[in-house]
Amino acid sequence: MHITVCVSQQKPEPWQQGLQAALPEATVSVWQPGAPAADFAVVWAPPQTFFDEQAGLKAAFNTGAGVDALLKLRIAPTTRIVRLDDAGMSVQMAEFACHAVIRHFRELDGYEADVRAGRWSYRKPRARADYPVGVMGLGVLGERVARALTVFEFPVHGWSRSPKAIDGVRCHAGEAQFDAFLSSCRVL
């Protein structure tokens, strides 16, 4: 079994070393143009050239959850595309989104500017009801973000291509509900 690693914007060596340690019977290489064909690939933002040269791949494992960029490339129909379903990213994304929403809601940038300027300015507390938050995409990551935001009692709206039902989240689906979703959100 030959595995090749083609990860743009990342160092490929940790992937190569980790895979080689986990699969000592496999040949694991870092892809270079003109390299021998592989059976499997670990990829992130590979160039079209990669798939042109690796037409016999059985599967390409994307190192992130989103595969939209891969689907724009010409890939042999026999090559399976595998994406991460979560791999711990949903918790990180929920933390990041909650931090960003609360930072904006509480006007923390303004308070920090006041601290740097050596002044204190009163800011009227905001009502959460006036800050509906929208989450685009309600897959594994989006659902986790939406659920996390409900804990802070923000009105949460979610949009996805297909209908979903999430406790505490007003779900919108499809192109027909997209404008209504956008107009219901103050923060997206």
Where are these regions (language model features)?
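N-terminal glycine-/charge-rich "phosphate-binding" loop or analogous flexible N-terminal tail
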Residues: 1-40
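A short, aliphatic-rich alpha-helical micro-motif
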Residues: 34-36, 51-54, 179-184
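Phosphate-coordination loops involved in phosphoryl transfer and adenosine-cofactor binding
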Residues: 2, 78, 129-132
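Short, structured coil segments at secondary-structure junctions
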Residues: 23-24, 55-56, 75-77, 152, ...
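Phosphate/diphosphate ligand-binding glycine-rich loop within oxidoreductases
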Residues: 39-112
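Short, polar loop motifs at secondary-structure junctions
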Residues: 10-13, 31-33, 45-49, 64-68, ...
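Rossmann-fold NAD(P)-dependent oxidoreductase module
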Residues: 18, 96, 100, 144, ...
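Rossmann-like dinucleotide/phosphate-binding beta-alpha-beta segment
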Residues: 123-188
